[in-house]
Amino acid sequence: MAIQSDSLSSLPDSPRIVAPQPVSPNEESIERALRPKALEEYVGQQRAREQLEIFIAAARKRGEALDHVLLFGPPGLGKTTLAHIIAHEMGVQLRQTSGPVLERPGDLAALLTNLERNDVLFIDEIHRLSPVVEEILYPALEDFQIDILIGEGPAARSVKLDLQPFTLVGATTRAGMLTNPLRDRFGIVSRLEFYNTDELARIVTRSASLLNADITADGAHEVARRSRGTPRIANRLLRRVRDYAQVKAHGVIDQDAAGRALAMLDVDPQGLDVMDRKLLEAIVHKFDGGPVGVDSLAAAIGEERDTIEDVIEPYLIQHGYLQRTPRGRTATLTTWRHLGLTPPAAASGGTGELFSK
């Protein structure tokens, strides 16, 4: 059965079409439908996939719970998908929550005591767990036990509860914010990387089939190369391009139709959107190419510091548009060329190597 695309009207006001986070509840439901169910269907992340194949197979042979898994990397790369795949491959249930939701120790205790043997507990944004909840988690991860306080005042007493063996899968975009005691309790740690164009083209082709969309190989490649190395963005662009092709290109997504659709959406051939160009232009025009501190840059473009660091910068740094230096952000030669500008003959402040041959 074909999966119905969400309508343009379902999107919030002025979302970034290249945002790596979901932009609507409708999109989240479509993501679930497009999500691969098994490791053999999972495209990309070869190192993480190969490691998980071995660790899962070994755990199943022993009849044990898989060791606790930490998945970290930029948003939209498949951390939630991998958590679901782990549960599927282990043949167990997955319980899903997030760090901000677990406000009190009792919230976590209720989840842990309801887990069946070898189940998977997935905590997204695990770096946002409160310290008091995190303390409850330590003995649960090490000994499959928790201590809960019953009663109040002088009559209160601590009771130790045994838990079924389980696997915690934690996901975070900010691995550096994890406390050392929590990080040390994960036996399997996998960093997810941005995808290359060929991998994304395979994802786009698979998703197009599930969406009952007619796409050519060069059409899939055109969508993939503008998707910023992120499957979530690739699937979102695909749905918008499908809408365009149905109205303007007889329903066929080829390279020309994809290119025209994405140009209409203001996504350039390198996958940069208005916000990316706004940041790069601010560094070049307002700060002479940098270096500029992130707080000054945030004020200049009217964005939060966290938005710049977590959402805009990772892709720009990964692809050589920005360089982080001890003195701040600096535009690279790639940025000047992308903006159609001539870089200064010599950069000051120790950044001359950015423009040297």
From Swiss-Prot:
List the SMART domains: AAA
| Organism, as annotated | Bordetella bronchiseptica (strain ATCC BAA-588 / NCTC 13252 / RB50) (Alcaligenes bronchisepticus)
Q: Which Pfam families match?
A: AAA_lid_4, RuvB_C, RuvB_N
Among PANTHER family, the record links this protein to: HOLLIDAY JUNCTION BRANCH MIGRATION COMPLEX SUBUNIT RUVB, PTHR42848
InterPro entries reported for this sequence: AAA+_ATPase (IPR003593), AAA_lid_4 (IPR041445), DNA_helicase_Holl-junc_RuvB (IPR004605), P-loop_NTPase (IPR027417), RuvB-like_N (IPR008824), RuvB_C (IPR008823), WH-like_DNA-bd_sf (IPR036388), WH_DNA-bd_sf (IPR036390)
Give the record's GO biological process terms. DNA recombination; DNA repair
Family recorded in the similarity comment: Belongs to the RuvB family.
Task: Provide the gene name from the record.
Answer: ruvB
What are the binding positions for ATP in this chain?
Answer: 34-35, 76, 79-81, 142-144, 185, 195, 232
Concerning NCBIfam families, the annotation shows: PRK00080.1, ruvB
List the residue ranges of the region (Large ATPase domain (RuvB-L)): 13-195
List ligand-binding residues for DNA: 305, 324, 329
Keyword Transport attributed: no
| EC assignment | 3.6.4.-
Question: Biased composition, Low complexity: where in the chain?
Answer: 1-15
The protein's predominant localisation is cytoplasm
- What keywords would UniProt list here? ATP-binding, Cytoplasm, DNA damage, DNA recombination, DNA repair, DNA-binding, Hydrolase, Nucleotide-binding
**One GO molecular-function entry:** ATP hydrolysis activity
Describe its partners and assembly state.
Homohexamer. Forms an RuvA(8)-RuvB(12)-Holliday junction (HJ) complex. HJ DNA is sandwiched between 2 RuvA tetramers; dsDNA enters through RuvA and exits via RuvB. An RuvB hexamer assembles on each DNA strand where it exits the tetramer. Each RuvB hexamer is contacted by two RuvA subunits (via domain III) on 2 adjacent RuvB subunits; this complex drives branch migration. In the full resolvosome a probable DNA-RuvA(4)-RuvB(12)-RuvC(2) complex forms which resolves the HJ.
Write out the domain note: Has 3 domains, the large (RuvB-L) and small ATPase (RuvB-S) domains and the C-terminal head (RuvB-H) domain. The head domain binds DNA, while the ATPase domains jointly bind ATP, ADP or are empty depending on the state of the subunit in the translocation cycle. During a single DNA translocation step the structure of each domain remains the same, but their relative positions change.
| Protein name in UniProt | Holliday junction branch migration complex subunit RuvB
What is the annotated role of this protein in its UniProt record?
Answer: The RuvA-RuvB-RuvC complex processes Holliday junction (HJ) DNA during genetic recombination and DNA repair, while the RuvA-RuvB complex plays an important role in the rescue of blocked DNA replication forks via replication fork reversal (RFR). RuvA specifically binds to HJ cruciform DNA, conferring on it an open structure. The RuvB hexamer acts as an ATP-dependent pump, pulling dsDNA into and through the RuvAB complex. RuvB forms 2 homohexamers on either side of HJ DNA bound by 1 or 2 RuvA tetramers; 4 subunits per hexamer contact DNA at a time.
